[in-house]
């Protein structure tokens, strides 16, 4: 598609930013929900004059020949369809935000709205009415048409809008996503083999899930799985991969959910570093330290430490180990 414009998708971080802004502004008792379009691409018609160019060819086993079918709506997954739909979704979102004053975001055919509990009915009416006026259909299935709530799911994660002591709210992976990932890890461990395609898929899904779990455990797992992506056939897992997958499994089950703070506490920055010079023959000289700086760049606290030769040997003489110590 030739275009000079780029459509910016509003994902999990944008929804989190919206919630944080409302909490910071003093808006309490927030609830949220997601509105999902029914068969989204099929709701966008192709211009009648352009339909002769929109033809799908399918082999007919009865007539034993290829037949062409003219499309009346956007074909799902086609590049032009995606771009055109994203423009439509962005326009709908702009109507909700600018004209209706709704705290709203959009991601493909999912529209997330966050509002006060007392305004939830009017917000629901505003969204459904605007879609009716535009001639677009929202999903009415029980699985997707879920009312406003303190805890709601959007884009594969769960937003918990209970205001915690310390002024923060939580974002975690949905139970369904956790169960699915645990099942896939168990399958890989049981088979003790993985193909490049399987490794790439698992790595991608673990990368998304890890963003909602506190800690850096996943980084090592993702790096290790990347080594298998070039393999066409299934290859045997090495011992390190099995260990990392088991650690990741426990991290998914019991890892602390992502916390987003919205309080007015002062911002501080912590800078840490380590150094290592010399060699084993002449002796190693090491150092490490940290600096605590306020939001204006003023140093609040700092420390430095020079490890002994024995200390350096304990960490194996590796600079990356020293850099982690502060």
Placement of each model-derived feature along the sequence:
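Catalytic-core region of right-hand nucleic acid polymerases
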Residues: 1-86, 172-225
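Short, conserved secondary-structure transition motifs
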Residues: 23-24, 39-42, 113-118, 139-165
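Two-metal-ion RNase H-like nuclease active-site motif
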Residues: 33-37, 266-281
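Mobile genetic element proteins and their domesticated derivatives, centered on retroelements
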Residues: 36, 56, 77, 89, ...
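Active-site palm subdomain of RNA-directed nucleic acid polymerases
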Residues: 61, 82-130
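A short, polar/acidic, helix/strand-boundary loop motif
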Residues: 65-91, 187, 292-325
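Amphipathic alpha-helical
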Residues: 226-261
């Amino acid at each position: 598609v030739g275009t000079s414009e780029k459509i910016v998708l509003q994902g999990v971080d944008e929804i989190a930013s919206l919630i944080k802004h409302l909490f910071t502004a003093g808006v309490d008792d927030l609830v949220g929900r997601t509105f999902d379009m029914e068969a989204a691409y099929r709701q966008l018609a192709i211009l009648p004059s352009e339909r002769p160019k929109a033809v799908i060819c399918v082999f007919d086993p009865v007539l034993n020949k290829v037949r062409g079918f003219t499309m009346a709506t956007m074909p799902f997954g086609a590049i032009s369809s995606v771009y055109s739909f994203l423009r439509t979704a962005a326009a709908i979102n702009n109507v909700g935000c600018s004209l209706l004053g709704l705290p709203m975001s959009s991601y493909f055919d999912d529209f997330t709205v966050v509002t006060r509990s007392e305004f939830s009915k009017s917000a629901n009416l505003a969204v459904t009415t605007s879609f009716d006026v535009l001639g677009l259909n929202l999903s009415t299935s029980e699985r997707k048409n879920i009312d406003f709530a303190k805890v709601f799911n959007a884009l594969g994660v769960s937003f918990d809008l209970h205001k915690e002591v310390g002024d923060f709210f939580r974002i975690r992976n949905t139970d369904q996503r956790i169960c699915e990932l645990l099942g896939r890890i168990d399958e890989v461990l049981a088979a003790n083999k993985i193909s490049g395609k399987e490794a790439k898929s698992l790595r991608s899904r673990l990368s998304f899930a890890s963003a909602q779990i506190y800690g850096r455990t996943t980084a090592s797992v993702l790096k290790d799985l990347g080594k298998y992506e070039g393999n066409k056939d299934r290859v045997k897992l090495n011992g390190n991969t099995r260990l990392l997958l088991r650690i990741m499994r426990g991290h998914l089950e019991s890892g602390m959910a992502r916390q987003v703070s919205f309080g007015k506490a002062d911002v501080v920055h912590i800078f840490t570093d380590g150094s290592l010079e010399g060699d084993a023959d002449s002796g190693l000289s090491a150092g490490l330290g940290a600096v605590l700086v306020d939001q204006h760049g003023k140093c609040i606290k700092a420390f430095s430490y020079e490890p002994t030769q024995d200390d350096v040997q304990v960490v194996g003489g590796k600079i990356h180990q020293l850099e982690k110590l502060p």
